[in-house]
Swiss-Prot record:
NCBIfam families: mycothiol_MshB. It comes from Geodermatophilus obscurus (strain ATCC 25078 / DSM 43160 / JCM 3152 / CCUG 61914 / KCC A-0152 / KCTC 9177 / NBRC 13315 / NRRL B-3577 / G-20). One of its GO terms (molecular function) is zinc ion binding. Binds 1 zinc ion per subunit. It is an enzyme of class 3 (hydrolase). InterPro entries: GlcNAc_PI_deacetylase-related, LmbE-like_dom_sf, Mycothiol_biosynthesis_MshB. Its cofactor is Zn(2+). One of its GO terms (biological process) is mycothiol biosynthetic process. This is 1D-myo-inositol 2-acetamido-2-deoxy-alpha-D-glucopyranoside deacetylase. Belongs to the MshB deacetylase family. It comes from the Bacteria. The gene is mshB.
Length: 294
């Protein structure tokens, strides 16, 4: 029997889903919803934080992508997510690296993907899963990574195309997604996290900025539509983050990426609603399915 609530998340690399939405995913799995993750690349260009695994990196053996499939599998087991896939199949699109790096020019880089082809792959998933809710990044990909921007483009175009009966009927019956959310962090929450790091004597990764308003992924609180409380599933998110060991170092309530600067692990995760109707007239929603039937 198909679960009545179905959530699809579209992300660029393994680990993005856990950092942005791990608590949300674990919560909805626990509540009996269908949670599907669609990851667009294997994350081949990521920096390796584990010294004994450094030779996996792109500049050495270039085997990191395959290793990260295993990390993603372990993370999904930690979150309880059974349905996780790669856009077009594992390795169809390669990690494009950070903006302005030589990896951007790789022919297989996701940044260079044929958008029509990539959208068709995503539409096939949307029409199969038939999610009421889709989660992805904003138009800047959160912080400007080429693959995040491309994941946004593919997800948003796929939502439109999947609803059009005239578009590729061979990919399944048309399906209209009721709500689309973009991942975000409210400015007030970022300020609190920076203050918490400072209280511990830790340097914030954003210390050089005059104000959190300058951060591309920090949004005014009034633009936030939902705050999903997943604190009851914090241990699952913590375990999933630890599963991505080549990319993330976890230390108590904080984590670090390759910059080795601490960020707070959020048990409550935040979203902007960009398609569909809010489920509550006042304040932030506490449920991405708020206002939907069933």
């Amino acid at each position: 029997m198909t679960p009545s609530r179905r959530l699809l998340l579209v992300h660029a690399h393994p680990d993005d889903e856990t950092i942005n939405n791990g608590a949300t995913m674990a919560r909805y799995v626990a509540e009996g919803a269908q949670v599907t993750l669609l990851t667009c690349t294997l994350g081949e260009e990521g920096e390796v934080l584990v010294p004994e695994l450094e030779l996996l990196a792109a500049e050495h053996a270039d085997q990191l992508g395959g290793y990260r499939i295993g990390e993603l599998r372990a993370a999904m087991e930690a979150l309880g997510v059974a349905d996780w896939r790669f856009l077009g199949g594992p390795g169809r699109y390669r990690d494009s690296g950070m903006m302005g790096t030589p990896a951007n020019d790789e022919p297989r880089a996701f940044w260079n993907a044929d958008l029509d082809e990539a959208v068709a792959h995503a539409v096939a998933v949307v029409r199969e899963v038939r999610p009421q809710v889709v989660v992805t990044y904003d138009e800047n990909g959160g912080y400007g990574h080429p693959d995040h921007i491309q994941a946004h483009r593919v997800a948003m175009r796929a939502v439109d195309a999947a609803a059009d009966p005239a578009y590729r009927p061979d990919l399944g019956g048309a399906w209209e997604v009721a709500k689309v959310y973009w991942c975000c962090v409210p400015r007030s929450v970022l300020r609190q996290g920076i203050e918490a790091l400072a209280a511990l004597g830790e340097e914030s990764p954003f210390a050089s900025l005059d104000d959190v308003d300058d951060l591309p992924f920090a949004v005014p609180d009034e633009l936030v539509a939902a705050a999903v409380d997943g604190r009851a599933h914090a241990r699952r998110k913590d375990a999933a983050m630890r599963a991505h060991a080549t990319q993330i170092t976890v230390d108590g309530p904080f984590f670090a990426l390759s910059n080795n600067l601490g960020q707070e692990v959020l048990g409550t995760e935040y979203y902007r609603l960009v398609r569909g109707e809010r489920g509550t007239a006042d304040g932030w929603e506490d449920d991405l399915f708020a206002g939907l039937p069933g």
